[in-house]
């Protein structure tokens, strides 16, 4: 076991604070509309230019082990805020630095660290409750666009494209961000349910100009097994021929004689039919077949629940307004399922997603939910160079997370104003001694830090701006974008309540732990000089005759 170096008391806290400051100072230059960029060196490819707090924090690793421990703990603040709300990482870092700095000063002055932490915790609990009171619902497209714009560093085009995407696919819909090919941002919306399985035979194509199959008002047969015997399909096909409507078969697979007969019937015009494989594998395939059944008002023919394909009737089939099949995917538009059943299925999947511990499973469940709820939107980010593309894509992703958070928990005045108002509204809290009271004061003072930093990044004096804002009431605040004061909501400067709340809670939690640190343990760094015992390798020169 390697030897350890141990630091106690003030020596440990000074080192830890140095690490906190290095990381926080690198992150906080990005805060606000006039925040600067940070350039991150990459071992391969072009450097990454970013204004995303968590991206900067993740890159920082310090040489001094004790300083690095402080930096890593603040990195955890940014990371947790990012996981919870997807934004607010820089705000969380600024809050953590402010609480740690003031807290360690108080500890050095002889105050009890545990009482300070209890005071900070009480102030934060009161602040979170007050934030909920200040919060306003965010449901209209204009407010969603404003939240996205602020989060994307005042880029209105990003805010608007996110608001449009949400309007098109609904609040539960899936919105993904991809790198585009053009200079401008583009929005692609796939309405209806789409899954990545194409036609099983090109002979099903009835739109040669697009290379696709289009079925108008088709019946949809859902089978949870391989179909290879045409006799199993005959009762359905005979019933279908009388109606004159087309048929889509979604099965584990359709092969051999069954596929050949379907192709021949389709080409002769006896029955208009197309077949695709069911999406997913194993249990996920069963679940997705059930999703399609609920969406289209059909029944999944599965032997495990006692249903046989030969005995299926037209009543077991689902229906939709339209189906489009390409070689890669199938889209079912306007399924005729019952609205109440679709909503119940979405609610059921939502509960599964919330309870899931796997990120992959969560993502797949959310995709299923979106396909049932209305569709999928893809924002294709446009830029002139790859470096700009990466920076812009990160901003779009942040803005998307922020708008989702705003829809979930509402919005408060942006620009750090909400925390200043919250701090001013918290009155006397139930504390048992002076040290706890000082802990409350530390937390309330720290709540001004984001506003001060936004002002400082805009070239203003933070204290002057903070005093001006404190003298105002309600949503009155400082717009760093154009250096004016006014009503933040009217100016469209909004922050999601969830983002502000998460930043405050995570910052106070980890900062409180750092204040109560009394001892730090790290491995002793071995000098390169101590590694000099490897010099005896020089006797390999006689290997030349091996050629």
Swiss-Prot record:
The keyword Transcription regulation does not apply. It comes from the Bacteria. It is found in: Cytoplasm. It is an enzyme of class 5 (isomerase). Keywords: ATP-binding, Chaperone, Cytoplasm, Isomerase, Nucleotide-binding. The keyword Cell division does not apply. GO terms for biological process: protein refolding. It catalyses: ATP + H2O + a folded polypeptide = ADP + phosphate + an unfolded polypeptide. Pfam families: Cpn60_TCP1. Its EC number is 5.6.1.7. GO terms for cellular component: cytoplasm. GO terms for molecular function: ATP binding; ATP-dependent protein folding chaperone; isomerase activity; unfolded protein binding. Gene3D superfamilies: GroEL, GroEL-like equatorial domain, TCP-1-like chaperonin intermediate domain. HAMAP family: CH60 (MF_00600). Forms a cylinder of 14 subunits composed of two heptameric rings stacked back-to-back. Interacts with the co-chaperonin GroES. NCBIfam families: GroEL (TIGR02348), PRK00013.1 (NF000592), PRK12849.1 (NF009487), PRK12850.1 (NF009488), PRK12851.1 (NF009489). Together with its co-chaperonin GroES, plays an essential role in assisting protein folding. The GroEL-GroES system forms a nano-cage that allows encapsulation of the non-native substrate proteins and provides a physical environment optimized to promote and accelerate protein folding. This is Chaperonin GroEL. It comes from Shewanella pealeana (strain ATCC 700345 / ANG-SQ1). The gene is groEL.
């Amino acid at each position: 076991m390697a030897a350890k170096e141990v630091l106690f008391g003030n020596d440990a806290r000074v080192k830890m604070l140095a690490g906190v400051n290095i990381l926080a100072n690198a992150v906080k230059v990005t805060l606000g509309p006039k925040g600067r960029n940070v350039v991150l060196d990459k071992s391969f490819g072009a450097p990454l230019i970013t204004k995303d707090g968590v991206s900067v924090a993740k890159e920082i690793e310090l040489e001094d082990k004790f300083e690095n421990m402080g930096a890593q703990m603040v990195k955890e603040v940014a990371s947790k805020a990012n996981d919870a709300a997807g934004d607010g990482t820089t705000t969380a870092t600024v809050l953590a630095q402010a609480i740690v700095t003031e807290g360690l000063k108080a500890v050095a002055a002889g105050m009890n660290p545990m009482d300070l932490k209890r005071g900070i915790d009480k102030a934060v609990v009161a602040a979170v409750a007050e934030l909920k009171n200040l919060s306003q619902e965010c449901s209209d497209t204009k407010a969603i666009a404003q939240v996205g714009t602020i989060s994307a560093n005042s880029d209105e085009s990003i805010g608007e494209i996110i608001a449009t995407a949400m309007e098109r696919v609904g609040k539960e819909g899936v919105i993904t961000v991809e790198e585009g090919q053009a200079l401008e941002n583009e929005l692609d919306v796939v309405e209806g349910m789409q899954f990545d399985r194409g036609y099983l035979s090109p002979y099903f194509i009835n739109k040669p100009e697009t290379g696709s199959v289009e079925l108008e008002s088709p019946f949809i047969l859902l089978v949870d097994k391989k179909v290879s015997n045409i006799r199993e399909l005959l009762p359905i096909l005979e019933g279908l021929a009388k109606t004159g409507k087309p048929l889509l078969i979604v099965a584990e697979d359709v092969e051999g004689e069954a596929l050949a007969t379907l192709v021949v019937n389709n080409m002769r015009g006896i029955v208009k039919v197309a077949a695709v494989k069911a999406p997913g594998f194993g249990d996920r395939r069963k679940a997705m077949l059930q999703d399609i059944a609920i969406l289209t008002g059909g029944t999944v023919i599965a032997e495990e629940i006692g249903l046989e394909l030969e005995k299926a009737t037209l009543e077991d089939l689902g229906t939709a307004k339209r189906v489009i099949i390409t070689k890669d995917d199938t889209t079912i538009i306007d399924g005729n399922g019952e609205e109440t059943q679709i909503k119940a299925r979405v609610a059921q999947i939502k509960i599964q997603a919330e309870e899931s511990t796997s990120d992959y499973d969560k993502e797949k469940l959310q995709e299923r939910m979106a396909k049932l709820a209305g569709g999928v939107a893809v924002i294709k980010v446009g830029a002139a160079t790859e470096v700009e593309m990466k920076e812009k894509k990160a901003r779009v992703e942040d803005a998307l997370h922020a708008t989702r958070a705003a829809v979930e928990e509402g919005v408060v005045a942006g620009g750090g104003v909400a925390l200043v108002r919250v701090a001013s509204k918290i009155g006397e809290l139930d504390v048992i001694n002076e040290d706890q009271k000082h802990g409350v004061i530390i937390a309330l003072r720290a709540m001004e830090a984001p506003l001060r930093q936004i002002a400082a990044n805009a070239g203003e004096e933070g204290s002057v701006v903070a005093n001006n804002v404190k003298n105002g009431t309600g949503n009155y605040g400082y717009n760093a974008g154009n250096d004016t004061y006014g009503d933040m909501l009217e100016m469209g400067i909004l922050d999601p309540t969830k983002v502000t709340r998460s930043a405050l809670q995570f910052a106070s939690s980890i900062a409180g732990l750092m204040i109560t640190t009394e001892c730090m343990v790290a491995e002793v760094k071995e000098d390169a000089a101590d590694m000099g015992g490897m010099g005896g390798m020089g006797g390999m020169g006689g290997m030349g005759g091996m050629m």
